[in-house]
């Protein structure tokens, strides 16, 4: 039994996980499948009741009187707003800007550009660390299915192939790298490791895999025979632009459709990540 501390002069609330946390496995709240209602009781009387939804991508919204609560956004209006891909491309055309430039301009209405860049590079660092862990760990993943990790062996085999034939990439070798990096992240997610929700946990392997691909195979200073690229690539601009563009596309889906696997299924969240 635990007690939730009083906040802002409120009361302490006794809370017993065994009896007070109730899971309704065959029921769903009206707005979204991932929902939770908090109810505080005083005897038989309800003192306060509030409902929250986890709608994917790290967004949490509260259910109020409005039947469809909206995500609370920053108060500063974006200078280049868009809700669809067509509107985004129109902004780029009208102002002769790239997608990353439009995204950065919108971000800098609420924070400095260097802060945005720093946060994006921090995201890359977490993605990279996740890939490295996934490519270096073996064994069986948690759960009753007893699934064995595969990314480490696949990664080791790819590195060996590069060493045997340096400078001579196989026709589909780059696809193999995409596969192993995505698998490494998915295995880390299954093991409870630290990942970046991009756009969701279930589809979190695709964006890091594509970004690693860009750094390894598309960066002007990259070495295609160097295995998995290091975290300090010397090409911060590519990384920042990649994540800004990915964020802009994800924003379109978040506003006009959904990025939540609970709402649109596994293929929906994976489809968003692949876009």
Residue spans of the language-model regions?
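Structural beta-strand/beta-sheet cores of well-ordered domains, especially the beta-sheet scaffolds
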Residues: 34-36, 48-50, 194, 203, ...
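Accessory "access/gating" subregions that flank catalytic or transport cores
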Residues: 114-266
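Active-site pocket-lining segment
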Residues: 269-275
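Solvent-exposed alpha-helices and their adjacent loops that cap or buttress functional pockets
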Residues: 28-32, 187-190, 235, 273
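C-terminal regulatory domains involved in ligand/effector binding and gene-expression control
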Residues: 2-166, 177
């Amino acid at each position: 039994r635990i007690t939730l501390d009083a906040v802002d002069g409120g009361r302490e609330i006794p809370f017993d996980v065994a009896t007070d946390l109730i899971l309704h496995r065959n029921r769903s709240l009206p707005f979204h499948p991932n929902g939770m209602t908090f109810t505080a009781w005083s005897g038989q009387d309800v003192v306060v009741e509030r409902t929250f939804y986890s709608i994917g991508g790290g967004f949490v919204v509260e259910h109020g009187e409005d039947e469809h609560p909206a995500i609370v956004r920053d108060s500063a209006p974006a200078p280049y707003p868009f809700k669809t891909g067509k509107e985004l491309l129109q902004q780029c055309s009208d102002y002769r800007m790239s997608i990353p430039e439009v995204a950065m301009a919108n971000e800098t209405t609420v924070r400095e550009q260097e802060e945005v860049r720093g946060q994006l590079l921090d995201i890359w660092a977490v993605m990279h660390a996740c890939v490295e862990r996934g490519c270096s760990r073996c064994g069986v993943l948690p759960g009753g299915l007893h699934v064995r990790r595969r990314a480490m062996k696949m990664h080791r085999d790819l590195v060996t192939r590069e060493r045997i034939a340096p400078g001579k990439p196989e026709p589909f070798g780059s696809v193999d790298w995409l596969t192993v990096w995505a698998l490494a992240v998915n295995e880390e997610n299954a093991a409870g490791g630290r990942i970046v929700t991009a756009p969701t946990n279930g589809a979190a392997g695709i964006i890091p895999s594509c970004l690693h691909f860009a750094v390894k195979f598309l960066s002007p200073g990259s070495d295609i025979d160097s295995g998995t690229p290091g975290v300090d690539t010397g090409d911060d601009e590519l990384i920042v632009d990649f994540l800004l563009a990915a964020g802009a596309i994800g924003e379109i889906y978040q506003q006009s459709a959904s990025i939540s696997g609970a709402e649109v299924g596994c293929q929906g969240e994976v489809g968003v990540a692949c876009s």
